[in-house]
Amino acid sequence: MARITVEDCLKQIPNRFELALAATYRARQLAQGHTPKIESRDKPTVVALREIAAGQVGVEMLKKVPV
């Protein structure tokens, strides 16, 4: 099993706080049934981090959050 680390994700989103918000929002989307952008059997939080590390998802997720 490949491990995902925060350092891998920080290469894509340098701000830890934005990273946490983007990962949280994406994980919630995945938990609600949205289609993952990568192939994985992991839990939504891990899939969200893997998507961020792969560059499939970024800070644009924060622009979709309703205020």
UniProtKB/Swiss-Prot annotation:
PANTHER family: DNA-DIRECTED RNA POLYMERASE SUBUNIT OMEGA. Belongs to the RNA polymerase subunit omega family. It comes from Paraburkholderia phymatum (strain DSM 17167 / CIP 108236 / LMG 21445 / STM815). This is DNA-directed RNA polymerase subunit omega. The RNAP catalytic core consists of 2 alpha, 1 beta, 1 beta' and 1 omega subunit. When a sigma factor is associated with the core the holoenzyme is formed, which can initiate transcription. Keywords: DNA-directed RNA polymerase, Nucleotidyltransferase, Transcription, Transferase. InterPro entries: DNA-dir_RNA_pol_omega, Pol_omega/Rpo6/RPB6, RPB6/omega-like_sf. One of its GO terms (biological process) is DNA-templated transcription. It holds the Pfam family RNA_pol_Rpb6. SMART domains: RNA_pol_Rpb6. It is an enzyme of class 2 (transferase). It comes from the Bacteria. GO terms for cellular component: DNA-directed RNA polymerase complex. It catalyses: RNA(n) + a ribonucleoside 5'-triphosphate = RNA(n+1) + diphosphate. GO terms for molecular function: DNA binding; DNA-directed RNA polymerase activity. Promotes RNA polymerase assembly. Latches the N- and C-terminal regions of the beta' subunit thereby facilitating its interaction with the beta and alpha subunits. Its EC number is 2.7.7.6.
